[in-house]
Amino acid sequence: KRISHAENFSTDLVHEIRNPLTSLKSASEILHETENHEQRTKLIDILNHDVQRIERLITDYSQMLKDEVALSKEKMKKINLKLIARSVVDDFNSIYEAKRGITIILNDLNNKEEYFIYGIENRIEQIIANLLDNSISFSDDNKKISVEIDKNENEMIILKVLDEGKGFRETNTKKIFDRFYSNRPDNFGEHSGLGLNIVKNLVDLHGATINASNNIAQKGANVEIIFPKS
């Protein structure tokens, strides 16, 4: 069982590092081509951020291997989901607007500055980054992705990621969160089937729920996370 845990964590780590490495590569390519000082400064910030993200991932997963437990609730604190979402969206836009013409929009449906949840900041960042990476992977060039933050009648905060991609082929969308499950169309290349499983595990860690569906009004997918009251 210990070997199985180690293998699972190692596989997850490889998958998680691949995302910031892709971002590093893209940012470095754009940095090499652009002469715009403001854009170069922003790209350098993204490079530094991704390096820190890789370092954090290695540290976190090493600790998980040692302890064979996820993160304890003692490490959680009250954090502003909107600020975290804005930071991740800005980083992704800096890369993918230039590289593929994909625009990510952050919509605050209640026009609030603060959406507090009880959680671990870098893990919430990881959730949003993985969802955006998944949407981008399924989207054609020059498409839009929306990140929506809302609060329901029970004062629970809702985070949604909606894209204009291929949507889910699977009618039972709960399966998409299974480890190694992939419903990616063949023309979208090889896919490990780990990204959404990692998201699901992190969502569970925060006592939140996650659901996926196809957009009814238009083509694309919709992933919704509901966080408990902080």
Regions found by a protein language model. Give the residues of each.
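Conserved micro-motifs of the catalytic ATP-binding
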Residues: 69-74, 114-119
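Short alpha-helical Gxxx[C/S/T] motif in the catalytic ATP-binding
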Residues: 195, 199
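Short helix-loop "hinge" at the ATP-lid/N-box region of the Bergerat-fold HATPase_c
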Residues: 135-136
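Short conserved segment of the HATPase_c
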Residues: 168-180
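A conserved beta-strand-to-alpha-helix junction within the catalytic ATP-binding
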Residues: 75-90
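Short alpha-helical segment of the dimerization/phosphotransfer core of two-component systems
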Residues: 49-54
